[in-house]
């Protein structure tokens, strides 16, 4: 029994360690890279597929991947994306065509001086030569500790007054002062938020989005409303060989489509309430005034349908309790209703919470579930409401506060005098004035003054006479007291005019980064400078007066001591002269150019490469791979792993990890003999990228009579573990990845010659993939779990790896290196050209 217990403990420990290595939250891996030296001395390479896990604590300034080749660091860095993928950043030329938005990125953060703002805040701008910058030393904010009694009180009263506190927030939505909002923004957001960095947004967008928080990753963007299943989360990320990951459009399940169609059909049917039912139970009759629901746009409002849909949702026998996630989102987002209405089956509450605002009428009062927000309101009740109730039904931003709000001043009219005239006035005046001017100056290092903007103002007559002024580089568009060029302002105006929605903050920031001219001498953090021009002084005075009127306060960082700030003087390197209107654009890339590869100083054959990310909390996370340098005239043999080297697909993953040898007999010696004849081996498997270390360790562990498998690049699927298993086990389509991968490798050698000489597999899918890359059937071999080797040209003939090793010289003749005795034109040799032709023989006459 002791032996059985020890064996069970060993198996359990091995499986536990294996699971830790395959956990999607900690999964990291790198696929080997193949570099091919061309005939002319240039280089081509396969994509650098590297993926890191454990990205929960990474910030923008830490998303830099360092690279070491053969133990030496190289002057080449990668950047991390939202899903953990690493990529290179390349600057586009001005004449290069536009790239898709998902491939655009910010430059790799620059590890600047310690103690100063990070690279993403500084960007790529520099000060002119000889400029002396004076500033204050950076002070660390002292965090106020929370009092212990506050924690005790909040924890003791949380369960008793949880619902009442939320309803109190709904009942009294008093706007906070700007200083309080700034304090909340500062406390709720980290300090190292960088603009234009992947996976993050500005503090304004993060804070003001309410329950519609901006996602940090692409998978989170698509799967926020779905159940957090690892398989479902990974299946919506599309990972393709040679390309960066992107969000795949999730197919809507058939059951949800049926439910939605049933709900629409039920809501469309008219239903007359029974005479005995009260208005609070039967809903609103058809003769009653239209009901205005909070958070719903008036132009998309249908009174009868909305009222009946609510009644159906509450009284339906199919009602089911809400999930905790839904309740949490509804309770948080009650103050800010979402832009779109979603169907949910809820159970009616048996009591009305105290403090819930209700609108009374002669026929009775309307009651709603506490999770459905405030009750409905009639249009003829609007003149009698106070500002607090109006704020519930007319929120400041109906599209989510993450968008840029143009109409903040005009929305205040609803709170001051909520009547129908002001509602119509605010609807028409929902957008501030958009002013045009030909003053220019967007690329200058000082702001545009009001006098200069007004002096070159564009009127309606000017635009009608000369519409071409929109292409004028001096055109400045003023929206919400901010200045933009036409390339940035046009999408903003078009979005508001066509869709009645503002562009998200991240989109506007991206447009500013790509389309706005970079300011010549502006430093991104506000240090003091001397000798301001008069125009700049006036603009600063105007800004200060405006901020004072609006009640904004500049946040003052509390210092550790009372010593006055001492100035810091920096000598900034000179900025190379460039065109003021040019803004560099950066794109993501997985491949290196020939010049970049040449700078790596690769050795012939295998080169060990280490990708590392250093974080503040996790230390250094490393990912290892190998870069193989081959020549354009090498001959390559392709080999599958699961079922070809191992005896079966499923057990080939598990048994080798438990120490069991599960390889075919004779395959190691056969591959070794083929390698001695001058052939290169390429291992191609549909395993996931996270299993790269595990797969490489297994191939190095395989040994037979002291002979191991030849070294070669191990090409795996760049997708996640669950996606790879789903494609290989459930869909049974591993050839989708193999065709794309092998075709890409083939392009590295072409148009010189066909690189592939033979291939080994175990499935018809492998045969299909090998045929797609031009391999003849005479050199395609498949093996079954019994170890029987079949040549696709003669399927009836069965052999083994041992027998094929005996005739390896015939099927895999030695590769001749260097000069050979072959003639350039054999048809002009003495034997072929000077000999007499053979006499014609009539075979029919002989028959």
Swiss-Prot record:
<feature type="compositionally biased region" description="Polar residues">
    <location>
        <begin position="341"/>
        <end position="357"/>
    </location>
</feature>
<dbReference type="Pfam" id="PF04571">
    <property type="entry name" value="Lipin_N"/>
</dbReference>
<feature type="region of interest" description="N-LIP">
    <location>
        <begin position="1"/>
        <end position="108"/>
    </location>
</feature>
<feature type="short sequence motif" description="LXXIL motif">
    <location>
        <begin position="651"/>
        <end position="655"/>
    </location>
</feature>
<feature type="region of interest" description="Disordered">
    <location>
        <begin position="97"/>
        <end position="232"/>
    </location>
</feature>
<keyword id="KW-0378">Hydrolase</keyword>
<feature type="modified residue" description="Phosphoserine">
    <location>
        <position position="154"/>
    </location>
</feature>
<feature type="modified residue" description="Phosphoserine">
    <location>
        <position position="459"/>
    </location>
</feature>
<dbReference type="Pfam" id="PF16876">
    <property type="entry name" value="Lipin_mid"/>
</dbReference>
<dbReference type="InterPro" id="IPR026058">
    <property type="entry name" value="LIPIN"/>
</dbReference>
<dbReference type="InterPro" id="IPR013209">
    <property type="entry name" value="LNS2"/>
</dbReference>
<feature type="region of interest" description="Disordered">
    <location>
        <begin position="535"/>
        <end position="567"/>
    </location>
</feature>
<dbReference type="InterPro" id="IPR031315">
    <property type="entry name" value="LNS2/PITP"/>
</dbReference>
<dbReference type="InterPro" id="IPR036412">
    <property type="entry name" value="HAD-like_sf"/>
</dbReference>
<feature type="modified residue" description="Phosphoserine">
    <location>
        <position position="155"/>
    </location>
</feature>
<dbReference type="GO" id="GO:0003713">
    <property type="term" value="F:transcription coactivator activity"/>
</dbReference>
<dbReference type="InterPro" id="IPR023214">
    <property type="entry name" value="HAD_sf"/>
</dbReference>
<dbReference type="InterPro" id="IPR007651">
    <property type="entry name" value="Lipin_N"/>
</dbReference>
<dbReference type="Pfam" id="PF08235">
    <property type="entry name" value="LNS2"/>
</dbReference>
<feature type="region of interest" description="Disordered">
    <location>
        <begin position="270"/>
        <end position="296"/>
    </location>
</feature>
<feature type="compositionally biased region" description="Basic residues">
    <location>
        <begin position="135"/>
        <end position="146"/>
    </location>
</feature>
<feature type="region of interest" description="C-LIP">
    <location>
        <begin position="586"/>
        <end position="788"/>
    </location>
</feature>
<feature type="compositionally biased region" description="Basic and acidic residues">
    <location>
        <begin position="535"/>
        <end position="555"/>
    </location>
</feature>
<dbReference type="GO" id="GO:0045944">
    <property type="term" value="P:positive regulation of transcription by RNA polymerase II"/>
</dbReference>
<keyword id="KW-0597">Phosphoprotein</keyword>
<dbReference type="GO" id="GO:0032869">
    <property type="term" value="P:cellular response to insulin stimulus"/>
</dbReference>
<comment type="function">
    <text>Magnesium-dependent phosphatidate phosphatase enzyme which catalyzes the conversion of phosphatidic acid to diacylglycerol during triglyceride, phosphatidylcholine and phosphatidylethanolamine biosynthesis therefore regulates fatty acid metabolism.</text>
</comment>
<comment type="similarity">
    <text>Belongs to the lipin family.</text>
</comment>
<feature type="compositionally biased region" description="Low complexity">
    <location>
        <begin position="270"/>
        <end position="281"/>
    </location>
</feature>
<dbReference type="GO" id="GO:0005634">
    <property type="term" value="C:nucleus"/>
</dbReference>
<feature type="modified residue" description="Phosphoserine">
    <location>
        <position position="217"/>
    </location>
</feature>
<dbReference type="InterPro" id="IPR031703">
    <property type="entry name" value="Lipin_mid"/>
</dbReference>
<feature type="short sequence motif" description="DXDXT motif">
    <location>
        <begin position="640"/>
        <end position="644"/>
    </location>
</feature>
<dbReference type="GO" id="GO:0008195">
    <property type="term" value="F:phosphatidate phosphatase activity"/>
</dbReference>
<dbReference type="GO" id="GO:0009062">
    <property type="term" value="P:fatty acid catabolic process"/>
</dbReference>
<keyword id="KW-0539">Nucleus</keyword>
<keyword id="KW-0443">Lipid metabolism</keyword>
<feature type="short sequence motif" description="Nuclear localization signal">
    <location>
        <begin position="135"/>
        <end position="144"/>
    </location>
</feature>
<dbReference type="GO" id="GO:0019432">
    <property type="term" value="P:triglyceride biosynthetic process"/>
</dbReference>
<keyword id="KW-0276">Fatty acid metabolism</keyword>
<protein>
    <recommendedName>
        <fullName>Phosphatidate phosphatase LPIN3</fullName>
        <ecNumber>3.1.3.4</ecNumber>
    </recommendedName>
</protein>
<feature type="region of interest" description="Disordered">
    <location>
        <begin position="312"/>
        <end position="372"/>
    </location>
</feature>
């Amino acid at each position: 029994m002791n032996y059985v217990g020890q064996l069970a403990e060993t198996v359990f420990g091995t499986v536990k360690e294996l699971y830790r290595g395959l956990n999607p939250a900690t999964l990291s891996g790198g696929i080997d890279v193949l570099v091919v030296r061309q005939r002319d001395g240039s280089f081509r390479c396969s994509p650098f597929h590297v993926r890191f896990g454990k990205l929960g604590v990474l910030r923008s300034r830490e998303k830099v991947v360092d690279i070491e080749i053969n133990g030496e660091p190289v002057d080449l860095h990668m950047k991390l994306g939202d899903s953990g993928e690493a990529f290179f950043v390349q600057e586009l030329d001005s004449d290069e065509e536009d790239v898709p938005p998902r491939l655009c990125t910010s430059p790799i953060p620059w590890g600047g001086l310690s103690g100063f703002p990070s690279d993403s805040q500084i960007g790529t701008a520099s000060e002119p030569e000889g400029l002396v910058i004076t500033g204050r030393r950076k002070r660390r904010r002292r965090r106020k500790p929370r009092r212990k009694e506050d924690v005790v009180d909040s924890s003791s009263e949380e369960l008793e007054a949880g619902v009442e506190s939320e309803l109190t927030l709904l009942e009294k939505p008093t706007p906070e002062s700007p200083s309080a909002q700034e304090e909340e923004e500062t406390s709720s957001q980290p300090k190292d938020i960088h603009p234009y960095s992947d996976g993050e947004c500005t503090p304004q967008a993060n804070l003001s989005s309410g329950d519609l928080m901006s996602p940090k990753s692409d998978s989170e963007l698509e799967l926020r409303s779905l159940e957090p299943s690892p398989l479902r989360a990974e299946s919506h990320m599309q990972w393709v060989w040679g390309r960066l990951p992107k969000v795949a459009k999730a197919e809507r399940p058939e059951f949800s489509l049926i439910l939605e169609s049933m709900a629409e059909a039920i809501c469309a049917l008219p239903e007359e309430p029974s005479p005995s039912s009260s208005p609070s139970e039967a809903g609103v009759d058809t003769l009653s005034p239209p009901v205005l629901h909070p958070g719903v746009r008036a132009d998309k409002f249908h009174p009868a349908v909305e009222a009946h849909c609510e009644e159906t949702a509450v009284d339906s026998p199919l009602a089911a309790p809400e999930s905790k996630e839904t309740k949490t989102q509804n309770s948080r987002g009650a103050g800010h209703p979402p832009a779109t209405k979603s169907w949910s089956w809820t159970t009616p509450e048996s009591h009305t919470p105290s403090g819930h605002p209700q609108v009374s009428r002669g026929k009775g009062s309307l009651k709603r579930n506490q999770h459905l927000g405030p009750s409905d309101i009639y249009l003829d009740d609007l003149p009698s409401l106070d500002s607090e109730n109006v704020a519930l039904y007319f929120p400041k931003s109906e599209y989510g506060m993450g968008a840029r709000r143009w109409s903040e001043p005009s929305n205040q009219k609803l709170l001051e005098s909520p009547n129908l005239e002001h509602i119509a006035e605010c609807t028409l005046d929902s957008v501030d004035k958009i002013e045009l001017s030909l003053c220019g100056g967007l690329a200058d290092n000082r702001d545009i003054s009001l006098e200069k903007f007004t002096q070159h103002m564009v009127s309606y007559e000017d635009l009608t006479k000369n519409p071409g002024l929109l292409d004028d580089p001096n055109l400045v568009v003023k929206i919400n007291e901010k200045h933009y060029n036409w390339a940035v302002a046009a999408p903003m105006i078009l979005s508001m005019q066509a869709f009645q929605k503002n562009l998200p903050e991240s989109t506007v920031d991206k447009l500013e980064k790509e389309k706005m001219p970079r300011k010549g001498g502006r430093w991104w953090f506000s240090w003091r400078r001397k000798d301001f021009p008069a125009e700049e002084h006036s603009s600063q005075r105007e800004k200060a007066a405006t901020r004072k009127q609006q009640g904004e306060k500049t946040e003052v960082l509390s210092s550790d001591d009372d010593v006055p700030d001492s100035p810091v003087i920096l000598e900034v390197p000179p900025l190379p002269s460039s065109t003021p209107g040019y803004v560099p654009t950066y794109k993501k890339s997985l491949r290196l150019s020939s010049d970049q590869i040449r700078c790596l100083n690769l050795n012939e054959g295998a080169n060990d490469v280490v990708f590392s990310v250093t974080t503040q909390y996790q230390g250094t996370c490393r990912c290892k791979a190998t870069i193989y340098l081959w020549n354009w005239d090498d001959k390559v043999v392709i080999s599958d792993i699961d079922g070809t080297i191992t005896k079966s697909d499923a057990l080939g993953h598990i048994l080798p990890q438990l120490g069991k040898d599960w390889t075919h007999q004779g395959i190691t010696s056969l591959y070794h003999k083929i390698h001695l004849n001058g052939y290169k081996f390429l291992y191609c498997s549909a395993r996931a990228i996270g299993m790269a270390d595990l797969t490489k360790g297994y191939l190095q562990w395989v040994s037979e009579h002291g002979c191991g498998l030849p070294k070669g690049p191990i090409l795996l699927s760049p997708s996640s573990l669950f996606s790879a298993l789903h494609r290989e086990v459930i869909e049974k389509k591993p050839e989708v990845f193999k065709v794309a991968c092998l075709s890409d490798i083939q392009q590295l050698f072409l148009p010189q010659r066909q690189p592939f000489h033979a291939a080994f597999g175990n499935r018809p899918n492998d045969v299909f993939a090998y045929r797609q890359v031009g391999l003849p059937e005479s050199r395609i071999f498949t093996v079954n779990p019994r170890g029987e080797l079949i040549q696709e040209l003669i399927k009836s003939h069965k052999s083994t790896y041992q027998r094929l090793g005996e005739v390896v010289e015939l099927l895999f003749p030695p590769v001749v290196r260097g000069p050979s005795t072959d003639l350039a034109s054999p048809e002009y040799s003495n034997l072929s050209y000077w000999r007499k032709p053979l006499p014609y023989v009539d075979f029919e006459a002989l028959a």
